[in-house]
Amino acid sequence: MKVVSVVGMAGAGKSEVAKIFEKNGFIRIRFGDVTDEEVSKRGLELNEENERSVREALRQEYGMSAYAILNLARIDLARKQSDVVIDGLYSWEEYTFLKTYYGEDFYVVAVWASPRTRYARLTDRSNRRLTLEEATNRDRAEMENINKGGPIAMADFTIINESSLKELKREVKGVISRLRGRD
């Protein structure tokens, strides 16, 4: 079974793409669930500052491949039943860990949108909304602290998400068809 990771900057549309994969038979695993669970376990409010703090603490404890390590059992269990889509791989180290572990069964789909488009989405979304300052700070932190650019650069497929949801669905279904043709 395939493991497909969706990567991109905040607001690019990673979760939308992962949901489209899910609707097409993939089991969706959201790496950020580990963060949410840890924030809750620590009795903290779920907000950007606390999420960033927990993400960085987990990476301090487990290394930069923390989220791949912490989600590996969930991925392996899901993979026994179906192809898997990962929503939220971030670091180069997570990428190399999963690429080494799954080899030819591991694929990366990058979702790209311009900063202007992403910031508009992030300041307008209903859950986990960010201010413009929080969005730009998150971009900087993710590029500087967690090596987010590498997995985007190494993607097997790239989707430009500057248009409509209808167009995004069309693009994603094309990628899914190409992946299924690789069996």
Please provide the spans of the model-predicted regions.
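Extreme N-terminal starter segment of soluble prokaryotic enzymes
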Residues: 1-4
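Walker A/P-loop
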Residues: 15
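Short, well-ordered beta-strand core segments
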Residues: 28, 108, 157-160
